[in-house]
Every structure is written in C-alpha cells, then in structure tokens.
Amino acid sequence: MARYEDLPYRTCVGMMLLNAEGLVFIGRRSGGIEHVDDSHVWQMPQGGVDPGEDTWAAAKRELYEETSVQSVEKLGEISDWLIYDIPRTVAGRAWKGRYRGQRQKWYAVRFTGLDSEIDVTTPGGGHKAEFISWRWEPMQNLPNLIVPFKRPVYERVVKEFSALGFPEPKASVGHR
C-alpha cells in the first residue's frame, strides 16, 4: 500500500444549491468510513469527476444523482481547486485506499424548481442514496455542520459565495 503522503487527491466537484430565500440545501449523510464524527453528518452535494468529463457537467450530474434536482441556474464558481485531506486513520479504507483526500471545484446554483423535485431517498438515474434526509440551512451555519476535516473547504465556499445567500429580488409592482 502506498504511503499516505504519496497518495493522490480524488478530482471532485461540489454544488451549493440555493433556494429563492437564499438558504442552502444540505443532506444528511447515510454514513461512511470517512465520517469519523456522527455529530457532523450534513453536507452539500459533491462527487467525483469522470475521466474526460467537464467539471460543470459533473456538478450537474452529481446534483441530479444525489438529489434528483435538474431545475437550476448557474450563479458562480470558485476558480481555485479546494483541497482537503481525510484523516490518516481512515485513509486506507476510504475510497479503497487510493486517495488521501479530494481536490474540488465548487459551483453555486439557484434552485428554480419546487421542493417536491428534491428526492434524496430515490435519487435520479437509479443511483444509491447518499443522503437519508435534507433541509434548507442558512449559509453561515454550514461550516459547523460538516465533518471537521472538511471545515476549511466549507469556510472558503461560504466566503466565496456569501453574496449569493440573499433572497432573489422580488419584482416590484408599478404605481398607478
């Protein structure tokens, strides 16, 4: 087995899904080796980029595979790749011991559909559910809900997208 320091990072994408009120979708993870702390089981959709796949296409695919959501409009992206290491104690078991962490490209999108479109228990494309429940959460709360080793990434995502976490402006009604 390769030394931890020699393992590569898995190339992934993350998606911040904002509703019209400026709240962010978070899903409650169904568990997994990399979740070392049961009190921090909430996260935004994220997943791997397939070989040759564009990161924006991967982000839309992952969002659909984890939430069934397709009704979105792109608001922004973080130009940098954000990186985190998984704890050494689980590195040999997570992702079959092939990676030391993830390098992620993050996107923000506005959800333009109805909440009834969201289905985490039988997500799109027949994929295995990664979440057991979901909710809308204020953006500033996100770093405290994620496992500690991902917290710096979430802090950066919140900082970069903080201006997007406001409600959509309502159309004004003209005066007669």
Swiss-Prot record:
A motif (Nudix box) lies at residues 47-68. The gene is rppH. Belongs to the Nudix hydrolase family. RppH subfamily. HAMAP family: Nudix_RppH (MF_00298). InterPro entries: NUDIX_hydrolase-like_dom_sf, NUDIX_hydrolase_dom, RppH. This is RNA pyrophosphohydrolase. GO terms for molecular function: bis(5'-adenosyl)-pentaphosphatase activity; guanosine-3',5'-bis(diphosphate) 3'-diphosphatase activity. Its EC number is 3.6.1.-. It is an enzyme of class 3 (hydrolase). Keywords: Hydrolase. Its cofactor is a divalent metal cation. Accelerates the degradation of transcripts by removing pyrophosphate from the 5'-end of triphosphorylated RNA, leading to a more labile monophosphorylated state that can stimulate subsequent ribonuclease cleavage. GO terms for biological process: nucleoside phosphate metabolic process; ribose phosphate metabolic process. PROSITE patterns: NUDIX. Residues 8-159 form the Nudix hydrolase domain.
